[in-house]
Amino acid sequence: MQQHSSKTAYVYSDKLLQYRFHDQHPFNQMRLKLTTELLLNANLLSPEQIVQPRIATGDELMLIHKYDYVEAIKHASHGIISEDEAKKYGLNDEENGQFKHMHRHSATIVGGALTLADLIMSGKVLNGCHLGGGLHHAQPGRASGFCIYNDIAITAQYIAKEYNQRVLIIDTDAHHGDGTQWSFYADNHVTTYSIHETGKFLFPGSGHYTERGEDIGYGHTVNVPLEPYTEDASFLECFKLTVEPVVKSFKPDIILSVNGVDIHYRDPLTHLNCTLHSLYEIPYFVKYLADSYTNGKVIMFGGGGYNIWRVVPRAWSHVFLSLIDQPIQSGYLPLEWINKWKHYSSELLPKRWEDRLNDYTYVPRTKEISEKNKKLALHIASWYESTRQ
């Protein structure tokens, strides 16, 4: 067995799998179990590193969410919410349907993040991984985009208030982290950075580069919208061009990163054209930023990712591996993992850590797309550096 870091905590419990709208819903937390078992089978995760999530309290949830919204979620948990209330709080459609005990299961996701926050801020661990979290669309008073409670925003506010720390949120999910952004739009203790597919063609339709915050929060919101069909080289170039100036200027005490893996070309809900190469590189760069600017303090969350068999387990494994300073993996996946899950998978499981790319489509407009992305990224970096001096 490889040597494991005792300074990294990994949140997992089968209770996290209960956050489930219905059997056919694209948000499927089985991806968390698939990832965890892959790490265990590959001897990359030690059981001693796993910590159990607690249930967040009402006061903790209301660091971000409105009282009436939390009460509505409690009522919906038991099927006692009216149609008008369900509509008001975003609980009346297939996207964010009601399910039994949804308050408790959602609060458990939040509690997992807060558990890591306390462990890190008390010096018991250096960093943490919460792949079951990353629900960045939830608004203070409304469910949205498969998200009930915004665990990232709550954790950021918790750390800012309880520990008087400056928090930077780095969101690389294909969808704009709108719920998190609006929670801190007029705040200067939390900075939000989101690089995502442009909202011109993708939910939630926000995240334009001109969304920069307001009042004392002006300049503390940074958005980098990318063109559809953006490929690896362009995504990574724009990410690195824009994110490090933000870190240097804001000088956070801790980073929270949202590691949605729906930028992958196999993801069914988005239009980006990246591969596992980007998804492996991103968390390692965030880890570099944390080591360089926050004394290593970082919590890495999950996020989007809807190809749960061929993409999420391999990509999310590297989120954890970046935290424990293990190298990017190559070669064959553990046979134990393949042999167990091949009976459940709706498609052929991968055999190797690398993408085969046998079905990858190269886009003729790659150069045009990349040039447009870079031009915007340079503009954003220049604007940010000039306004923060």
From Swiss-Prot:
This chain belongs to the protein called Acetoin utilization protein AcuC
CDD domains found in the cross-reference section:
HDAC_AcuC_like (cd09994)
- Family that this chain belongs to: Belongs to the histone deacetylase family.
Return the InterPro entries for the record.
AcuC (IPR003085), HDAC_PDAC (IPR050284), His_deacetylse (IPR000286), His_deacetylse_dom (IPR023801), His_deacetylse_dom_sf (IPR037138), Ureohydrolase_dom_sf (IPR023696)
Annotated GO molecular function terms are:
histone deacetylase activity
Q: What does this gene product do?
A: Role in growth on acetoin or butanediol. Involved in the breakdown of these compounds used as a carbon source.
Membrane-spanning residues: none
Q: Which UniProt keywords apply?
A: Acetoin catabolism
| Pathway in which this enzyme or protein is active | Ketone degradation; acetoin degradation
Q: Name one GO biological process term.
A: acetoin catabolic process
Q: Domain of life, per the record?
A: Bacteria
Report the source organism: Staphylococcus aureus (strain Mu50 / ATCC 700699)
Q: What single Pfam family name could you report for this chain, choosing any that match?
A: Hist_deacetyl
Q: Which PANTHER family does the UniProt entry name for this protein?
A: HISTONE DEACETYLASE HDAC1, HISTONE DEACETYLASE HDAC1-RELATED
